[in-house]
Amino acid sequence: PTKKVGGKADNSFAPVAHTVRMESLQDAFSTAELRDFDRRVQGSVDHPRYVVEPKIDGLSVSLEYRDGVFVRGSTRGDGDVGEDVSGNLRVIRSIPLKIKDPLPYLEVRGEVYMPHRSFEQVVDRQQIAGEKPFKNPRNAAAGSLRQKDSSVTATRGLDIFVFNIQQIQGKTLHSHKESLDYLKYLGFHTVDDFPCYADFDKVLDEIHAIGERRGDLEYDIDGAVIKVDDFDQRQVLGSTAKFPKWAIAFKYPPEEKETKLLDIEIAVGRTGVLTPTAVLESVHL
């Protein structure tokens, strides 16, 4: 698939209309598609530089601040309208309720996720309680963020990486890398490293390196994101009806892991047909 479909806002949470659309990114699955992206960019702007970041496999949210104080948080929803989940976002410890600079207004975008260690603890508790366990950290993060009781969300060990400034008043920024450094200064969690390259071969090398580290990370990623760094160049490039033209997401192939065959169960159908079913030791993908 080349388009990630967003969810509609649920009636049980107050709807939030995003004043700046929370866009999705065009996906690429090959080096050839990435080079096509670079050619399109080079055809419109001179000497672009690209920031490369891991693509966190979580839930995209908007955080809003007035005079430096957190006032509202919402899900992406369909990009135009999301859900108000402020109460549940407030209990995520890595989300600052007050930032260092009392900016008149700030809206940032981030990805809420459940670290592997938290996921294992939550699943253990579910199994002990006889509940159906979450299938993966992304589902667990989604279920936890949409709890009606924020005290339950607080026990789930959620975290966030903030990766974009949607709107800002009281500060002028000129590039994506500058904005990420500023987000760190304000007190937000960002990814540890966000290198910036003019040489597209180095961009491709970085994407490969992120993929190699994928299995060692404490959180799930499903790709890497390439973004034009300069904000003026982004304005020139603009957007299609669906995606910004200044960014693209490279999607890694699904992870493969070895497991152990525990048993083979044979089921006999009504007509006597034997159907074997393999019982495998569970692994986290």
List each language-model region with its residue ranges.
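RNA/tRNA-interacting regions in translation and RNA-turnover enzymes
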Residues: 1-285
